Amino acid sequence: MKYNDYLEHLELREGNEECVYLDSLGKPTCGVGHLLTERERQVYQVGDEVSEEQRNAWLEQDAAMAWEAAAQQIEDLGIETAEFIIVLGSVNFQLGTRWMDKFPSAYKALKNKDYDEAIRQVSTGSGKDGQSKWKEQTPVRVEDFVTAIDKLR
């Protein structure tokens, strides 16, 4: 079942932290990469432990939103490879469901089936050593996406 594979992939890449911590951008986060809302930040402070039940509820909500966005994007992109949704869902989970606003040229290249250009667009940029800031911060996540794009050929 693809959705369960997707959830396992998210937990593998994000971890499942029991306590609230600051992510690489300094934002309070907990569970499987859940960014705390303003309301949640009033309840939970950095270092606070959060119940497994609450963390699972956040995961269900966040993962479903990213999965739905990925499904719509796959349809828009005309991609028929079923496995691609796992990684594209992960991209939506990490970068947000409007990730293509951050990487418009990559999205356009995917739509045009120009996979070399899509890979270049997500890999290079204004970050350290000419790589994208996304790749600089989370190289394994970018490599997941690059590998999935490469398999579309």
Identify what each model region corresponds to.
Residues 29, 48-52, 109:
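Short, low-complexity, polar/charged sequence segments that are solvent-exposed and flexible
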Residues 22-44:
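Substrate-binding/active-site groove segments that recognize
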Residues 7, 27-29, 85:
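A residue-level signal for beta-strand positions that form part of recognition/binding surfaces
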Residues 43-76, 82-86, 92-104:
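Alpha-helical segment that forms one wall of the substrate-binding/catalytic cleft
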Residues 1-17, 34, 56-60, 67, ...:
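Long, amphipathic alpha-helical surface segments
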Residues 2, 21-24, 80-83:
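Extracellular/periplasmic catalytic domains that process cell-envelope and extracellular macromolecules
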Residues 9, 20, 25-27, 90, ...:
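N-terminal hydrophobic or amphipathic segments with adjacent small-residue motifs
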Residues 29-31, 87-90, 117-121:
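Structural recognition of the beta-strand scaffold that forms the well-ordered cores
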